[in-house]
Amino acid sequence: FPQPQEPFPQQPQQPFPLQPQQPFPQQPQQPFPQPQQPFRQQAELIIPQQPQQPFPLQPHQPYTQQTIWSMV
C-alpha cells in the first residue's frame, strides 16, 4: 500500500505543471506585440485632437463668468 501511493502523486505533479508553463508564456508573447502597433497609431491621432479641444474651451470660460456677473 505505501509503495503505490507514492508513485501516483509524483507522476501527475510533474506533467501538469510542465504542460501549462510552456503554452502560457508562448501564446501571450505573440498577441501582445501585435496590438501594440495599432494602439500607438491611434494614440498619435488622438494626441493632436486633444490640444484643439482645450483652445476653444478657454474662450468659453470667460463667457460663463460674464453670465455669473449678470446674475449678480
From Swiss-Prot:
Low complexity: compositionally biased ranges: 37-50
Transmembrane segment boundaries: none
Q: Where is the composition biased (Pro residues)?
A: 1-36
Q: What does this protein do?
A: Sulfur-poor seed storage protein.
Organism, scientific name:
Hordeum vulgare (Barley)
The record's tissue-specificity note reads: Developing endosperm.
Record keywords, A-Z: Seed storage protein, Storage protein
Name the Gene Ontology molecular function terms of this record.
nutrient reservoir activity
Q: Which segments carry the region annotation Disordered?
A: 1-61
What is the name attached to this protein's record?
A: C-hordein
Q: List the disulfide bonds.
A: none
